[in-house]
Amino acid sequence: MPAIDLSTIDLRAIKPSDLDWRKFTLDTGHPMRRIFIWSVAVNMGIGQSGERLEKAAKVMSELTGRTPSYRLAHKSIKDFGIRRGEPIGLLVTLRRNEAVWFLLRALAAVDFTLREESFNAGNVSFGIREHILVPGSRYDPALGIFGFDVAVTLARPGFRVQYRRRARADVGKDHRVSREETIRFFQDVLGVRILKR
């Protein structure tokens, strides 16, 4: 049973404050074993700086409600006209209510259908070809159409130990989220259909 009945809500009008990210968890019987959405990263690779990148930044901030950070080129590629250190992409990381809010809208853009190959241990990635497919977004001829990638990371309570500054430690193998659990989370909690290979 999905955590939210999508037939009763309008994804074009929903706001992050209307959602509670704690409801979007997969209960596995023990409070420390429950699985939840850790983060949703939205990435746009533009491949060039300048006006097109600024337009993409405007589109991304409208989509996510956050100011994107600029991603820089790691090396110079003369054929593409890219210099090292030049901004060529955008990234926004969303957490908690904003993450669930954006993920529901992004999944609606792909009809709540994902390929089995998109899943690995605790992570899911998928792309959207045109940002206007996302409910609530609008087409602006002055900006154009951009595609983007969505990367979702799932976690369990206690995962913070691998990111904290003091007394950092690895998460045990048995406590990590497996690929099967990731697929089950998306099917049971978000109501996603999985396309087999």
Give the predicted meaning of each segment.
Residues 2-197:
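Ribosome-associated RNA-binding proteins
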